[in-house]
Design a protein with these regions (language model features):
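A membrane-interface helix-boundary motif in multi-pass transporters
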Residues: 150-174, 364-388
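Helix-loop boundary and gating motifs at the non-cytosolic
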Residues: 2-53, 217-256, 323
């Protein structure tokens, strides 16, 4: 792959995840503090990610893979998304805000597959080349959080009170317009199939991969993945409002350290998989979720700040050791014929169904433990900690270890 193309793809990935990180992390704080949203309403807003994940396969399967170049659809979706971001910036109530965020996520979630398609089409050896491109996406997310906290200080207590967090949507809008325009100059990525080819709902939803459920061990893992997305949703939805409310300085910037941790443990993951094996690696990932929420439950922004920081830094183990390991396991079990269908199915099940249940649960728990306007954060965090521990115990008892091939 030419250096010029590598640079183009790296910029694309950077902007793709800069956009997401620019507003998604702080949305819960903005909604609760500036639009006086309830936990249930905040859950509705975050659930748009899940609805987008559920709808995305239809957009990709029925349109992107058949009629238009991927880079052109990417451009159109981001230009339209930038317009919706401007509407979110101007919204003055949750009722005004919600239709725009729903529309935006329906447009944004398909772009995650599109940037991968554009990248893979240019690569001769995706196994070696893709990670070097994808890491710029994580860098984009980190830079977005760093700018919000350390440069603009939009998430400081005074700035939040003044409504400055709405500027995150403006920043995301500008980045969306930039990526939308830039996309039309990306290398051409034609449709992967002809417009005349018949596409079934079974193919779109990855249902060909259902045969994997004949393997009891994989079925246990699949169900566990959906269930673990419930505590995962608590982090996305409640972590920033929690850290902001208790007075942790630069909360969004510090949360970006979790992505730094993610990159480090991503590089270390093959080592641990080889030394520990599949089951122990997955169990460590589950245990990390329990520990993270216990640290949040008993930490504070004073003498126990270190507990909060460790909870944030556990993100690499939480995500990589379970969810990335799960992708590797799925890839190994599926084989070449249904590999894409299997990855599509588990993505739909986790980011669609699992997270949808998770966001709803997080909203319910948040409202249940908000008494006379005061959030009982200890109780809010103990709920996902207990649930993650229950999943951990059940998984320990019923999942059998398997050997999978891992390239160091």
């Amino acid at each position: 792959m030419k250096l010029s193309i590598k640079i183009q793809l790296s910029i694309m990935m950077f902007l793709q995840f800069f956009i997401w990180g620019a507003w998604f992390v702080t949305m819960g704080t903005f909604l609760s503090q500036n639009l006086t949203a309830t936990g249930a309403e905040t859950a509705m807003a975050y659930s748009t990610q899940s609805w987008g994940a559920i709808i995305a396969p239809f957009i990709i399967g029925l349109i992107a893979d058949r009629f238009f170049n991927a880079e052109r659809i990417l451009g159109v979706l981001h230009l339209a998304g930038g317009g919706l971001m401007l509407m979110m910036f101007g919204a003055e109530s949750f009722d005004d805000f919600y239709p725009y965020v729903l529309g935006y996520m329906i447009l944004y979630m398909p772009t995650l597959a599109l940037v991968n398609s554009v990248s893979f089409y240019q690569m001769k050896d995706a196994a070696k080349e893709f990670s070097l491109i994808r890491v710029f996406g994580t860098v984009g997310w980190i830079i977005a959080g760093t700018l919000i906290s350390y440069y603009f200080s939009w998430d400081s207590s005074s700035s939040v009170a003044d409504g400055m967090l709405k500027n995150t949507f403006l920043m995301a809008a500008y980045a969306s317009f930039a990526l939308g325009a830039f996309s039309f100059f990306l290398p051409k990525t034609p449709p992967s199939s002809s417009a005349d080819d018949k596409v079934s709902m079974r193919q779109i939803l990855g249902l060909d991969a259902l045969k994997l459920f004949n393997d009891k061990n994989y079925l246990i893992f699949f169900i566990s993945s959906i269930l673990l997305c419930i505590p995962l949703a608590f982090y996305y939805q409640n972590a920033n409002p929690f850290l902001t409310e208790i007075g942790l300085s630069n909360p969004t910037g510090k949360m970006a350290w979790g992505q730094v941790s993610e990159v480090i443990f991503m590089l270390l993951l093959p080592y641990f998989l080889i030394r520990l094996g599949l089951k122990k690696t997955l169990l460590i990932g589950m245990l990390a979720w329990v520990l993270r929420y216990l640290l949040f439950a008993y930490g504070n922004a004073d003498e126990k700040t270190a507990m909060l920081i460790v909870g944030i830094l556990l993100h690499g183990i939480c995500y990589d050791f379970f969810f990335v390991t799960g992708q590797i396991y799925t890839d190994a079990k599926a084989g070449p014929k249904i590999k894409s269908a299997a990855q599509g199915l588990i993505t739909l099940a986790t980011y669609g169904i699992g997270m949808l249940i998770g966001f709803w649960s997080a909203g319910k728990i948040y409202d249940a433990y908000t008494i006379e306007g005061v959030n009982q954060w200890k109780d809010i965090w103990l709920a996902p900690a207990g649930f993650a521990f229950l999943i951990l115990v059940l998984f320990l008892l019923v999942f059998k270890n398997e050997k999978i091939e891992v390239n160091e």
